Amino acid sequence: MSHDSDARHGARLAAVQALYQMELAGGGAEEVAEEFIAHRFGETPTDEDFFKSILEGVPARQSEIDKAIAACLTESWTLARVDSILRAILRAAALELVARRDVPARVVIDEYVGIAHEFFAGDEPGFVNAALDRMARRKRAKEFGLPTPDDELDF
């Protein structure tokens, strides 16, 4: 990995942890971002601006992001049933898929499946891969050589 990709990976991992903290303990994006930057950054390279864009973007677009995630889950799963760290992973990835067209969909999927592997040893990374692949094919159909579905225009 290059320094830039390491820094982006660090930002994604920190954003997932911060989103998890926000969901469990409360607190706004700005407050949590300040805490992470002051106390948790430094050990690994982290792109602070990228981190903040994810951390601020998810709450700002949460209802539409959650709708996009729910549409990619199987009928037997609801977003509320998904483990809270998996929810944070899916939300951060969904934000990138809908708001960061400069990042290829396959990179987003690979990065967040990798992050899922950092937290889980079981089937969860496969779950993340399947959900994000479905979402990417709907939201970024052109990148996969697919016809553009109507819901790609939802965001």
Identify the residue ranges that each predicted region occupies.
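N-terminal interaction/assembly modules
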Residues: M1-F155
